[in-house]
């Protein structure tokens, strides 16, 4: 049993004295794991784009990878702490929440858009927010930010219900505002597929707090590090 595909490194951890357990995201095969030998070459890092060949006797076996790095993530992320923390966050989210062997080509393509913007030193906040929104929607927990859940109005949408993940208008939500989450304009635009200019650092931080709430609630309750790392990230953004 053998296949070959491009993939993005989602994580590595030691496995015995001579191997690493490697997790990669591929476009056509989804999240895949396998063993790869430790070498004297530069170690694989999260975000690396690799040409991966997987081999095993049976498709249900863990299998082994042989890998060639096509594009290193080092220079795109490791000089910018916020960018690096976002890379660490999304790879942790996807390697933890995505089921193995289930293709999510839209997620893969969105990650590549984020990576391209990061490498080009272009505005990348919106690309990252789209990634986290896609994780929620692809796994069945999409936020509905297109209209008010009560009145169906598309105007003055200022709140999100923490229970349903649906938008509420100012008129409907004002009396309950202390129990609701704010709705940043950029999240609504991205969720509805509307092109918009890159958000500010403050709006990015607020959006990360909101998405972090839903990601933890639905997908990452067993993660002991996600909430703390999200607090650090939003704190760096001011």
UniProtKB/Swiss-Prot annotation:
Record-level GO BP terms: DNA recombination; double-strand break repair
InterPro entries: ARFGAP/RecO, DNA_rep/recomb_RecO_N, RecO, RecO_C
Record carries keyword ATP-binding: no
Gene Ontology, cellular component aspect: bacterial nucleoid
Keywords in alphabetical order: DNA damage, DNA recombination, DNA repair
Pfam families per the UniProt record, alphabetical: RecO_C, RecO_N
Function, as annotated: Involved in DNA repair and RecF pathway recombination.
Family: Belongs to the RecO family.
Xref: HAMAP family: RecO
Stated name of the protein: DNA repair protein RecO
């Amino acid at each position: 049993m053998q296949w070959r595909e491009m993939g993005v490194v989602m994580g590595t951890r030691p496995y015995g004295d001579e191997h690493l357990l490697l997790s990669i995201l591929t476009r056509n095969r989804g999240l895949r794991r396998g063993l790869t030998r430790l070498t004297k070459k530069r170690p694989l890092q999260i975000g690396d784009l690799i040409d991966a060949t997987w081999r095993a006797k049976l498709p249900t076996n863990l299998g082994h990878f042989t890998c060639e790095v096509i594009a290193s993530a080092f220079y795109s992320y490791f000089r910018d702490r916020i960018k690096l923390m976002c890379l660490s966050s999304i790879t942790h989210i996807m390697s933890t929440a995505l089921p193995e062997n289930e293709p999510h080509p839209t997620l893969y393509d969105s990650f590549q858009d984020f990576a391209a913007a990061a490498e080009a030193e272009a505005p990348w906040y919106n690309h990252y927010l789209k990634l986290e929104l896609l994780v929620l929607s692809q796994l069945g927990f999409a936020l509905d930010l297109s209209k008010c859940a009560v009145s169906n109005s598309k105007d003055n949408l200022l709140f999100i219900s923490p229970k349903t993940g649906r938008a509420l208008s100012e008129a409907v939500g004002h009396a309950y505002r202390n129990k609701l989450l704010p709705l940043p304009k950029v999240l609504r635009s991205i969720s509805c597929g509307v092109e918009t200019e890159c958000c500010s650092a403050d709006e990015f931080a607020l959006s990360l707090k909101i998405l972090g709430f839903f990601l933890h609630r639905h997908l990452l309750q067993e993660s002991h590090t996600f909430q703390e790392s999200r607090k650090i990230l939003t704190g760096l953004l001011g």
